[in-house]
Structure formats: structure tokens, C-alpha cells
Amino acid sequence: MNRLSNEDRAKILHLLCEGMSIRAITRLTGASKNTVAKLLVDAGKACAAYHDANVREVKSARVQVDEIWSFTYAKQKNVATAKDAPEGAGDTWTWTAIDADSKLIVSYLVGSRDAEYAVAFIQDLADRVAGRFQLTSDGLNAYIGAVEDAFGDDIDFAQLVKIYGPTVTAPGRYSPAECTGTRIRRVRGDPDGAHVSTSYVERSNLTMRMHMRRFTRLTKAFSKKVENHAHAVALHMMFYNFVRIHKTLRVTPAMAAGVTDRLWEIEDIAKLVEEAEAKPAKRGPYRKGISN
């Protein structure tokens, strides 16, 4: 069986991180679809493990959180009639938390947009940030209980609630109604109204759509398995935090946040995959959990 060199792995991973679909990569590199897909899975696992172990004790004054929509296998309205729809088909949400100063993605979670995932996401965020900070979310009610459970009174939390105009119905329209204004809802602590914003996390949503082909609207490159969707997100977050230089900061977010003291290359992510392969596999019962 042929094995990809680290150079070939790095090339394929870079193409994935720059928004290219799996089939397009096979046409460019000559690697099989299964080879590219397996590398995505292996890289996603390695990147998720590295993030979990190393993005800890982050010093942050302000964090913004949001959820970005995509779908797996079929859109939610079509899942009931879709042929052989797998578990996890339909709406797929990615929860993200960004540090407003360093632009580091501190925490992320792939799953549903409900109270259970809100609790898991906010608890993970609490485990990664050191000290008290100001948190801003959108108006999703699930955040209120999740923040109370994770932080109690040790946080300054506000929600930026958007006010929308009337819904415009037109053939092929998929965007939401026009936002006509916002209002601040102070939930816990003493949040500074001047910094109640979700602008940075919403801008990072655009970066995700530009750098992951499966997030691009109106294409056939959407995820077919929710597990692979989560692996793609993990790879992107590693690339965004450690490899891609932020234009404004002139360093990577991980460097700006003090998580690392050097600029990573895409080859470093390929090395993470190689190191993970060298470790003996752990034996034990399979337990399906929430994808991080």
C-alpha cells in the first residue's frame, strides 16, 4: 500500500485549508478520493487533540461567541425523504468563541443548536480561559442557562439582540431578513456596553465559509458525514490559529494570544498526523460523544 510523504500530505492539507473540495484535490494531485478523505480524518483527529491539550489558560479580556449554520447529507427539510440518510443528517451547527484582541478561536463545537450543546460549548470555553472576562453572544436563549452553569457570577455577560425587518420571500432566497437594529441585553455582571459586540466572531464565520468548501452555500461539496464535518472544522481551526498570519495582527492568533512563540507551517500539521500514527492505538469501548 502506497503511503503519502509528509510533503504530499502538507500539500493536500494546504489545499483543504484554502477552500478546495476533496474531488478538486484529487484532480489536482492525483491522490484518490479515499486517500484525501482519510487524511482529512487523521488530520482532524490530530488537530482536535492538539487544540484540546494546548489551548488552555488563555488570558482574555473579551470573548465573542456565535453559531454558524451548515448541513450534512441533506437540508433539514429533506432529511425525512432522503435515501439512506445517516445519523446526524440535516442542520449542522458550529459553535465558536473568539478572543476579541488576539482573534484566537478559543473553543469550538460541532453539533446541534440547542441547550445541550450550549452547555457543553460554554463549559469548554470556561475550561480554557483564565480569569474573569466579558462575554458577548447573540440573542440565543440557550446561552443564558449555560453561562450561569459554567461561570455563576464570575463573568460579565451581555447579549447583542438583533432586530429584523419583515421577511422577504422570493424564489431561491436563502438569506435572513434584513437586520434593522440591535439592542443590548445585560445578563450577568457588569459588561461594558462599548464592547458588547459580535463583529469579530461574525467575521470569523466568513473566514470559515471561505476556507472550508463544505461551508460554501449553493455547492455540491457539502458534508456527507457529520464526523467528517467535525474533522474539517478541527483542521481549519488549527490552520487559522497557528498557520495563517492575521493581516491586522501581522502574527498568527496563537502567537498573539501567547499560546505559541513561533509561526507554524502547514508541514507542522502534517507532522502532527505522523506523530499520532506513531502512537499505539488505545483499546477500550466505543463511546459516542459530542464532536469537538
Predicted regions and their residues:
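Residue-level recognition of single "structural anchor" positions
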Residues: 1-292
